[in-house]
């Protein structure tokens, strides 16, 4: 993304963390609750023009038992925190790709269930409603990318490329950048 936007003109700070959730505590992995980490991140990266949020896949884990609507409540909390900590920043909310149909089966990720797949497919609708209510930009990642056949959860390089291009186009639209 830095390369496409032009080094020097734009600076991208990536804060992805494997296992991060919106509001849930992972009893086996510390510091995965996004709402607890966000205030420090906002302070670290003050004066961001645009903050992109793509969370929710890990919230679909069976241990949390969360519905898409409950995950949406976590997203609403995150958006509120951004509004409070970075009031001048624009926000792009991205609903994550769907989990693959077999992600919960033996040989894949036992932290997910069949219900997890269904919940992941409902996130875009919930997130779109939040984006409309909050008057923020929205992108449905599942419209552009899908999980790899290898693990049914993460994107392969081609799907990363497809999603990156969609995000790039959305950033251009939001920021009014002329190519």
Regions picked out by a protein language model, each given a short descriptive name:
Residues 8-23:
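A short beta-strand-loop structural module common to alpha/beta enzyme folds
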Residues 22-33:
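Structural motif
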Residues 1-8:
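A short, Lys/Arg-enriched amphipathic alpha-helix followed by its capping loop at the start of a domain
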Residues 32-179:
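Alpha-helical cap/lid subdomain in secreted, periplasmic
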